[in-house]
Structure formats: structure tokens, C-alpha cells
Amino acid sequence: MKPARVRIALTVLSILVAFVAFAVWFMTAMPGTRHRGPLQPLGVGDRQLLANLKAHVVAVASEEHNVGRPEALERSARYIEATLSGLGYAVSRQEFETEGVKVRNLEVRRTGPGAGKARLVVIGAHYDSAQGAVGADDNGSGVAALLELARLLKSVQPAEGLEMRLVFYVNEELPWFATEKMGSLVHANGLALGEREVVAMLSLETIGWYSDAPGSQRYPFPFNLLYPSTGDFIGFVANPRSRSLLHRVIGSFRRHAAFPSEGAVGLESITGVSWSDQWAYWNFGWPAVMVTDTAPFRYPHYHTLRDTPDKLDYDRLARVVLGLESVVRDLVIAAPSN
């Protein structure tokens, strides 16, 4: 090969190597340090949290509950409403119809001082199950976590100009995902029509199953080349536009929670990256992060009738909730930067 061609080939190779290195850094570099080592016992005061999480999952996800099973879906919705009302919240309904069934999103708010339209920090979880599934992990775990966050955060005072919204969505699962009947898309569209600004959104999606067994964790390409093979962590996933929020969220979680965590930035075309309610907010250009145990990439009972309340690890779920409580407090005390 001629010297000129060698130089060109080396230059091209150097550019490719630099591009790959940058892409890996962009996707995987996260603030803080991942917790390693044994978990400390939960405190005495945290036992109530653990018991509440179990009770919530049993109440909302002991049977298939979706538009195809409207009575069960209604029971889950009423439990959520009753629990929030019992905590002293005024529960707002966003009602619409799906195949002749009246369904609803449920929302509670805490608003900081100041005039004008507050910027929004939205924490959400869907409460419907997939067809043919009980839905304890997907997504009774997310609903239980959000109900407990409502309890833990009921006295929070958002900063001036900020409003915290806790939202329970219907119709996240197929066949409604990414359609006009998807609950979170209905919610996000309503905010856009009202000219509201979402500065941060967290989607709590399937967060209750963990394993210490080597090989228990799988990933879509290219994450399988970059992340650990043991499913003992909680994951935080964002699209490139939400990278700044992801760093803020996982940095806060790692400061406050002695629990393993991993973060990833991925294109929405990568399998699984957009598989939850954060997708609805991405559609409007708002920063949003999915919090997940990675669902089908770890959980053997995903979308089956075996996804029952007895399968979940409530001790570890409680630790995740405590970490998320601190994350949300950090988000609503000061305005998140986009």
C-alpha cells in the first residue's frame, strides 16, 4: 500500500475510534459512584414503607386489569384514588373513553409559591396490566412506589415557580401504547395544549425484581457490551435530549441511596429505550427518564399470569423508593436545568 493511502487509512481509523469512544462515553458516563457491596438493613421506620408497598401491589395487581377487564381496572383506579384521598390529596381525574370503556388518569399536585404558570416536575406510573398478565412488577411495583412517594412527599414545598405532579396513567400497555388512547400521551398532550412546560419527568416502570445471580441480566445491543450481567441494580434510561436530566437524577440517587444503580443514554430506536410513559413526553421535546429494573431483560415472569405479588423483592423496592424520594425532593426544591 502506498504511503499516502496508509496515512488516509490511519486517519479514517483514528476518526472511527474517536467516534466510538465518544459514543460510549456519551451513553455510559454517569456522575457519582455505583454502590457496591452488601446492603445495610432497613431502618425500623422503613418497615412501614415495606409493608405499605406489599399492600399496594396486592391491591392493584392481583388480577389482570386493563380495558379488556374493565371491572378489575376500575378496582385498581378506585384503590389509588382512595389511598391518595386518605393522604389528604385532592385527586384530579382526566377521563376519556377507550372502546366504550370509561377510563381515567389520576393526578395529585403540590405547587410552589409564585404567580403565573408553574413549570412542572412530573412523576408517573401506569396502573394497567398487559393483556394476559397480572402485572405485579409491570406495573404494580411502579404504582406502589408512586403511592408511597405521595405519602413521603405530602408535605413537600416546591420551589417558587415549580409544581410537582404525581400521575397514575391508564392504557400504557399494548394495544394502546403509542396511540391517542395511551394515558400518558393524553396527559402530555393536555399539558402541551395548556402551554405548560415540563422541566423533568420520571416514569416508574417495572421496578420490583432483582437478582444476585451472575447472568441474570440481559440487554439489547449495544448495551450488552457495556453493562454488568447481574440484575441487582435499578436502571435510569434517557434519550439523548434528556441526558442532562438523567445525570441530575442518577447523581442525586447515588448521593442519597446505598443501592446499585446504572444509567444509560440511548437512541429511541434501540429496543426497550422508549418502552414506557417517558416516550409520551419525549414526543413534545420534554426531558424524561425511565426508572426500571429493565423488565423483560431481567424478569422471567414479564407479561405473564405468573407476574404476581409474591414474586417481588419488597426490601429492595423499598430502598429504591427511599432513593427516589430524595431525587424528587432535589428536583422540586430547585429548578432542573434542561
Residue ranges: model-predicted function:
Residues L10-T28:
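Hydrophobic membrane-insertion alpha-helices, especially the h-region
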Residues A130-R241, V273:
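Acidic/histidine-rich catalytic neighborhood of metal-dependent amide-processing enzymes
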